[in-house]
Amino acid sequence: SALPESAIARFLMTLQIGVVMDPIESINVKKDTTLAMLLAAQQKGWSVQYMTQPDLYSHEGVSRAKVRALTVEDNPEDWFKYGADKDIELNELDVILMRKDPPFDLDYIYSTYLLEQAHLSGTLVVNNPQSLRDCNEKIFATQFPQCCPALLVSANPGRLKAFHLEHKDVIYKPLDGMGGSSIFRAKPEEANLSVIIETLTQHGRRQIMAQRFIPDIINGDKRILMIDGVPVPYALARIPATGESRGNLAAGGNGVAQPLSDQDLWICQQVSSALKEKGLLFVGLDVIGDYLTEINVTSPTCIREIDAAYNLNIAGDLMDTIEQKIALKAR
């Protein structure tokens, strides 16, 4: 039955939010997007329950976890305090943020099964656990060919070499890397082409991606954040270190915030409805020049850097969106 608005307002002030993340003691406080989210949730008066992947379990068909109450502050010396731990059914939580960083491995997939059971029983899981499994960061982008550079996904060394012959300057990358690991650029005269392809494909067994090199990388690999299909109007351009062809901050890139271009907005428009449909509430697009190269759904970052440059509160906007979704269900 419909609750009166005053009751809904009271309910929204007491939400229980869970977070599945890497150990909080080892985060980089200044840059951590998950911390920004937890600070924003706490700002709303919500109580935070913390868990790592191994804390999740299922008993007699019900997903549960050992959780710890958590309070956070924006202090690089002292950013979190644990409260009591307890054992709960996941559906006692109103919302769960799945913020475990890749690798996207079997343990990650098992976690999504456990979270999916909670999602189906009424807890809002961000992002939708099924979509976390369905949307590989590199391959998902290929569903929008109008936005992408020339690319190929293949395990076949001959086909991958032919792509190099056609495009001359090519980036080869694994489909599961993070932070720019194992990304190779093969220029026209690359002597090690066969070795690069053999290594990445494990001698023709593993699918990898080949992508025409985009010279615009010198102006940065832009990270564009989207909240429920709506872009944040500023991007973080990660400028590669001198002599590097990878802009990732983890690979030594340097971040510069800037407004979205018309082409950026067009790309956002192309992908928006698919993101909403799939329950991907918080997503990071990677755009180089005019091209979409990746759609990051597992645990996109860069909130803190864009917030600082333009005095925004992106995590606050995300929490507002989550709150609206929960209010809609309560009504």
Predicted regions and their residues:
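Anion (oxyanion) recognition and catalysis
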Residues: Q42, H119, H164-L165, K276
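Structural detector of well-ordered beta-strand residues that form the stable sheet scaffold
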Residues: Q49, V125-V126, I171, M209-Q211
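Phosphate-binding site of ATP-dependent enzymes
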Residues: G158, L165-D169, D176-L265, L275
